[in-house]
């Protein structure tokens, strides 16, 4: 089965072809970073229009790159949610229309399920069950995954997501968008112990809170009164986020008795987070798994693969084009 995956939940237009026998046949990705950079964040209307502009050219590029003919596509998977309404709708309309024209099934995929399953595309994929740490611009969650569609929420952020905190602090520091990679780069030359930023809710269950940390950084920047300590601020802020994510992940593994941790989402590319996770998990004889570097950020491959997992069980959507901008993973069902 060859599945076309379409990702348009935010500011990346990603398309990919997943072959159940040959694996990933090809993928293309267009980022809108330059478009949104001058605004310091994603402008939903601009994002939607840019998806419309790029979908057909990227589709043609993907088919040429992979050597797959449009008629060979067996099914279409598109991101149904969560995400920006307009952005989701462009991908859903494109995918549903294409599937209808080819007389093939289509299925709407949960964006974060795609991220969580992306490490299964690696050369050494994890086996179920595992704990998943999902960290992105819109989500920070710990899930126990027992199988496709069998997800138990262990903890989540009660306010800002980790990636959102990175972006907001970067904006405070006048760093370019996107904030996460730029803070990580600046942190390399800073002292992570220079400022003792709070780790809210560190010892309170498995939920997260990052708004207080963001406020603490804002207060510290005002105290510095123009003194350039940006590298130390970046390193200390990043350390507070990483410390919280690592300790909560270890706690989740101990609480569930599981020995495998999957980390997925854009923030999973953070090298300091990976380094600290590997060190901490080695102490409890647990393993950590990541997606391939190209699959950490939003992409079509994860949507194609997640869609395939459900399509092979006979699950697909009707003719109606549906999007779900707010969609808890716990509402997902087991494909039957």
From Swiss-Prot:
UniProt-listed Enzyme Commission number(s): 2.3.1.234
Name under which the protein is recorded: tRNA N6-adenosine threonylcarbamoyltransferase
Enzyme class: transferase
Location in or out of the cell: Cytoplasm
Purpose: Required for the formation of a threonylcarbamoyl group on adenosine at position 37 (t(6)A37) in tRNAs that read codons beginning with adenine. Is involved in the transfer of the threonylcarbamoyl moiety of threonylcarbamoyl-AMP (TC-AMP) to the N6 group of A37, together with TsaE and TsaB. TsaD likely plays a direct catalytic role in this reaction.
Binding site for substrate: 134-138, 167, 180, 270
Gene Ontology, cellular component aspect: cytoplasm
Cofactor note: Binds 1 Fe(2+) ion per subunit.
Gene3D superfamilies (alphabetical): 3.30.420.40
Primary location class: cytoplasm
PROSITE patterns reported in the protein's UniProt record: GLYCOPROTEASE (PS01016)
Obligatory cofactor(s): Fe(2+)
Residues that, per the record, bind Fe cation: 111, 115, 298
Pfam (any one): TsaD
InterPro entries: ATPase_NBD, Gcp-like_dom, KAE1/TsaD, Peptidase_M22_CS, TsaD
Entry similarity comment: Belongs to the KAE1 / TsaD family.
Catalytic activity entry: L-threonylcarbamoyladenylate + adenosine(37) in tRNA = N(6)-L-threonylcarbamoyladenosine(37) in tRNA + AMP + H(+)
GO BP term, pick one: tRNA threonylcarbamoyladenosine modification
NCBIfam families listed in its UniProt record: gcp_kae1, T6A_TsaD_YgjD
UniProt keywords, alphabetically: Acyltransferase, Cytoplasm, Iron, Metal-binding, Transferase, tRNA processing
PANTHER family: TRNA N6-ADENOSINE THREONYLCARBAMOYLTRANSFERASE (PTHR11735), TRNA N6-ADENOSINE THREONYLCARBAMOYLTRANSFERASE, MITOCHONDRIAL (PTHR11735:SF6)
GO molecular function: iron ion binding; N(6)-L-threonylcarbamoyladenine synthase activity
